[in-house]
């Protein structure tokens, strides 16, 4: 969400207040909004339907923004963003974001530092997690059968480099030319809660790609993440998952899903349920937003084609 001079705007929450569409949600910064698309069965004109849905949702938000005299832009890293847009005044008002920020600051025990070496070098420091707000992505999900998950997840890891190479679009941050896709380095460092001692112990960063192939089942990934990363936020959980299964119901696994949402693997395993049935998905998180809706659908088609065409 941009002001007339194409700098980040504070108007995101005001736009969100005027919307009754559940597809539109907030993000950590007031100038970022998220559009969630409906799932489609991969057959016939699925990509065209996804494109049409994206266009329809975009037009709705664009009209709401225009009433506030604001503009919308799809961009992995906005070239006009700078440190003045990373103060707490620009953080979204929802309590969750304040809690996450406070917990991460307390865990780290010092400011969040970034050092990125590219064509130029950037060294900067911030006392909040709002470096994360510089990143926006086009997150793609593919539902996978449980029996195929290990093979498909490993394949998603294998193809990540060529897919990212075809989709890079964020070379600039704070006026510096850095990586061809600066989001990768920035996101990893912006949420790195490790102290120097943690680094010496080779503790895993919370944003990571992975360091081994998956061998047995998706539960190995979830167990590994639970063992490696402490809880950041919790919510009341009244459901007894084992009892739900015994009664023939589909458990929500709410605690697992909340924790999984704070582990930022570039290919993230996801558990969900819909229509009374559980499902597993692989979420691609490394492709940037934009620069146009056509580009996003093209990136989706490329990734989807590779995922479905695995040898």
Stretches with model-predicted labels:
Residues 1-311:
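Phosphate/nucleotide-binding catalytic core
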